[in-house]
Design a protein with these regions (language model features):
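Membrane-interface junctions at transmembrane-helix termini in multi-pass inner-membrane proteins
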Residues: 205-226, 364, 422-448
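N-terminal membrane topogenesis motif
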Residues: 1-97, 267-271, 288-308, 488-513
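Interfacial segments at transmembrane-helix termini and the short loops linking adjacent helices
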Residues: 111, 180-198, 331-334, 395-425
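Hydrophobic alpha-helical transmembrane segments
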Residues: 192-197, 225-277, 468-493
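Alpha-helical transmembrane segments of multi-pass membrane transport and lipid-handling proteins
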Residues: 62, 159-187, 237, 241, ...
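Helix-loop junctions and terminal segments of transmembrane helices
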Residues: 132-148, 217, 340, 344-368, ...
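Signature of the first transmembrane helix
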Residues: 45, 58-64, 76-136, 306-329
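Membrane-water interface segments that mark the loop-to-transmembrane alpha-helix transition
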Residues: 79-94, 98, 120, 132-181, ...
C-alpha cells in the first residue's frame, strides 16, 4: 500500500532486510499496517468529522500532507457509492431524457429518416470516441503531475493541449467539407444533410473531453454530473425544436452540434473553477532544456493517448458497426433495427458515463500502488439493475414494448431484441474494463479490441443485412470480447498482487550469474 503522493511505478523487486533470518524494516512496517488498516476501514463507515459548509455537505478534514491539487483516496464501498452516485444519477437522467427524445423523434420522422439518423449518430460516436482518448491522456498526465508535487504545471500544460485541439478541429472542418458527399454516398444516405454538423460535433467533443478530464482528475464528480445534465438537456431541447420544426435529419444533427458547443463551454468554466487553487498556478521558469524525466513522461503520455485513441475508436466501432453495416447492406430494414439498437445501447451509454468515474479512480489508485476493484464493483452494481430489467422486457414482451415506444412500423425486428440486449450487456462490461485497464497503463488491451472489431466486421457482413442474424453475430463477438477482457483483468491483478506478496514477505529475485 503506497503513500498518496508516491511516484507511480511497480513495486521493487527486492526488500531491504537485515541479517539472515531477520525480518526487514519494510516487512515489519507492512505487518504493522496490516493491523492498523482495518481500524481505518471501520472508522470510514462512522460519522464524518469535518467542517460544515453552508449549502453543502460536510467537508472532511484533509490529511496532514497532501500534494497540491491531489485529492486523498477513500477505498471503501460507501465512498465509492458516494463518489459514483452523482455521475450515475446524471447518467440515468440523461439516458431517460434520451429515451424520451428517441420516442418523440421516431414519431416525428419517417422510418427511412429514422434509420438515417441512427447511422449519423453511430458515425458521431465512432468519431468522438478518439476524443475520449484525449481524456485518458489528460487524466493520466494531470494525476502524475499531482502525485509528483508539480500541480503548478497543470494549467500551462492544459492551455497547450487546448491550442492543439483547436488547430485539429480547424483541419477537420476542411477535410469534412471536402468529403461530405462521399461520406453520404458510402453510408447510403440520399444527401449530405447533417454530415458536416455531426462530424464537427464529434470534433468539438475533443475539447469537451479535455475539460472533463480535468474534472475527473480533480475528482469533481458533482461538477462532471452537472455537465452531463447540461449536455443532455440542451440536446433534448434543440433536437425536439429542430425536428418538430420540419428540419428532419439535418435538424437532428444541428441539435447535437449545439449541445456539444454549450457543454464544452460549460465544462471549460467548471474546470477553470475547479483548478483555481493558487497551488496550481503556473510558475515562470528559467527556460533551458527539458529534464530527462519530463521527456520520459511525455513519451509515456503519447503512448497512453495513442493506445486510448485506437482503443476507444474501436469501442465506438463495436457499439455501432451493426446498425451502420445493416443500413448499408439492407437500407429497408435499418429503421426497425435502429429501434432495438437505440433501446439496447442505452446500457452502453450508461457504462460510458460510469467510466468517467472509474478511469480516474483506477489511475490514481494504481499510481498509489493499490487497485480500484471496489470502484469497478460499484459501477457494475449501478449497471446491473437496468440491464436485468431491459433483458426481461426483451425476452418476455419485446413486440408490445417496441410498439408502445416506437410504433408498430418500427417493431418488426422484435425477435432480434433479446440477443442485442445481451450483446450490449457484454459490451458494457468491456467498456468499463477498458477504462479501468487504461487507467492502469495496460496499453496492450488494444490488441483485444482490434481482434474483436475485425471479427465484428466479418460476422456482421456475413449476416447480410438480416436483423436477427446481425444481432446474433453481434452477441457472439461481444461475448468473446467480454470474456477476453475479464481474463486480461484477472491476469493483470494476479500479477500485481504477486508483486505485492513478493514485497510483503521479503522474497527477492536471485541476481543473474
Amino acid at each position: 500500500m503506497g503513500d498518496a503522493g508516491a511516484t507511480p511505478g511497480p513495486p521493487d523487486d527486492h526488500t531491504v532486510s537485515g541479517g539472515a533470518g531477520e525480518p526487514g524494516l519494510e516487512l515489519i512496517l507492512e505487518e504493522v499496517e496490516s493491523v492498523v488498516e482495518p481500524l481505518g476501514e471501520s472508522a470510514a463507515f462512522g460519522p464524518a468529522a469535518g467542517i460544515a459548509v453552508a449549502g453543502g455537505p460536510l467537508v472532511p478534514m484533509p490529511p496532514d500532507e497532501v500534494a497540491p491539487g491531489l485529492v486523498s483516496s477513500d477505498n471503501t464501498v460507501k465512498a465509492g457509492l458516494a463518489s459514483a452516485g452523482p455521475v450515475a444519477i446524471a447518467g440515468v437522467v440523461v439516458n431517460v431524457a434520451g429515451a424520451l427524445l428517441v420516442v418523440a423523434v421516431a414519431r416525428l420522422v419517417t422510418s427511412r429518416s429514422y434509420g438515417e439518423i441512427a447511422q449519423l449518430v453511430g458515425l458521431f460516436f465512432i468519431l468522438s470516441m478518439p476524443g475520449s482518448a484525449v481524456l485518458v491522456g489528460v487524466v493520466r498526465r494531470v494525476t502524475e503531475l499531482q502525485a509528483s508535487g508539480q500541480a503548478y504545471l497543470v494549467r500551462k500544460w492544459v492551455a497547450r493541449v487546448h491550442r492543439i485541439c483547436l488547430v485539429a478541429i480547424g483541419v477537420e472542418l476542411v477535410v469534412v467539407l471536402a468529403l461530405q458527399s462521399w461520406i453520404a454516398r458510402w453510408l447510403g444516405l440520399p444527401n449530405g444533410h447533417g454530415v458536416v454538423l455531426i462530424l464537427m460535433a464529434a470534433g468539438i467533443w475533443i475539447l469537451l473531453s479535455v475539460d472533463r478530464g480535468l474534472l475527473q482528475a480533480h475528482r469533481s464528480y458533482r461538477s462532471l454530473a452537472a455537465n452531463l445534465m447540461v449536455e443532455g438537456g440542451i440536446r433534448t431541447a434543440c433536437v425536439l425544436v429542430t425536428v418538430a420544426g420540419g428540419m428532419g435529419v439535418g435538424g437532428y444533427a444541428l441539435g447535437i452540434f449545439v449541445s456539444e458547443l454549450v457543454a464544452t463551454a460549460h465544462a471549460h468554466w467548471l474546470a477553470n473553477r475547479a483548478w483555481a487553487d493558487p497551488a496550481t498556478a503556473p510558475v515562470v521558469g528559467g527556460g533551458g532544456t527539458r529534464p530527462p524525466e519530463e521527456l520520459l513522461a511525455r513519451r509515456r503520455l503519447l503512448a497512453d493517448v495513442s493506445a486510448a485513441f485506437v482503443g476507444l475508436a474501436l469501442l465506438g466501432l463495436l457499439q455501432n458497426i451493426d446498425v451502420i453495416l445493416l443500413g448499408r447492406l439492407n437500407h429497408a430494414h435499418v429503421g426497425p433495427y435502429a429501434a432495438i439498437s437505440v433501446a439496447s445501447k442505452g446500457l452502453v451509454f450508461g457504462a460510458l458515463a460510469l467510466g468517467a468515474y472509474l478511469l480516474p479512480e483506477a489511475t490514481i489508485r494504481w499510481n498509489e500502488g493499490g487497485h480500484a476493484i471496489r470502484q469497478l464493483g460499484v459501477t457494475l452494481l449501478f449497471l446491473a439493475v437496468p440491464s436485468v430489467a431491459l433483458l426481461g422486457i426483451a425476452v418476455f414482451v419485446p413486440r408490445p414494448f417496441l410498439t408502445l415506444v416506437f410504433s408498430a412500423r418500427l417493431a418488426t425486428a422484435a425477435a432480434a431484441f433479446a440477443p442485442l440486449v445481451l450483446a450490449m450487456m457484454c459490451l458494457s462490461f468491456t467498456v468499463l474494463a477498458t477504462n479501468y485497464l487504461f487507467g492502469t497503463g495496460s496499453r496492450w488491451i488494444v490488441l483485444l479490441l482490434v481482434g474483436g472489431s475485425g471479427l465484428a466486421v466479418v460476422l456482421v457482413t456475413l449476416a447480410d443485412g438480416r436483423p436477427g442474424a446481425t444481432a446474433w453475430a453481434d452477441l457472439i463477438v461481444q461475448a468473446l470480447l467480454a470474456f477476453g477482457m475479464g481474463a486480461a483483468f484477472l491476469a493483470i491483478h494476479i500479477r500485481h498482487r504477486g508483486q505485492h506478496w513478493s514485497k510483503r514477505f521479503g522474497w527477492q529475485r536471485l541476481p543473474a550469474r
